[in-house]
Amino acid sequence: AKTVFVLPNNKNIIMAAEQAIPLAKDRQVRVLQTKTIPQGISAMLVFDETQSADDNQMAMMDAAAHVETGSVTFAARDSELDGRPIKQGEIMGMCGSKIKFLGDDIVDIAFKTVDKLFKRGEHALVTLIYGADATEEQAQALENRLSEKYGSDMEISIVDGGQPIYYFLLSVE
């Protein structure tokens, strides 16, 4: 390939990726500033090999910009948020990088997180990417709850991502 697109999918990696560009002497490297895995996936899905690098870059960044990302993970240690104690192992629902929900039920926290991110009329597609420590049954239970609430306003896809640390990565477009 004459042009390589790098999708860091993490805000902490973008600068390092950009600094590595001069090391690629035999091809053009473009770092697209994707900050989350769902943004990167959305960007990849619109790539069209028949288009120019500039057109692809614009389309990919536009796709990434329209993705709201949520995640469901666990507290690695005891801490505190806004005066509320968080216990090690407690389930956390995050909208972007902000902790919004705490609890002990993975599906409930994931439902609340998607519910917070999803806006009728603005969004239509939700992708539930379940990780190594979540089950397909949990993903289906989440899909059922979301379908009950949103019906045909929300198209839902379930993907076995197998990722560590995150029970769910949630993409809202």
Question: Language-model features: where?
Answer:
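N-terminal loops that bind phosphate or other acidic moieties
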Residues: 1-173
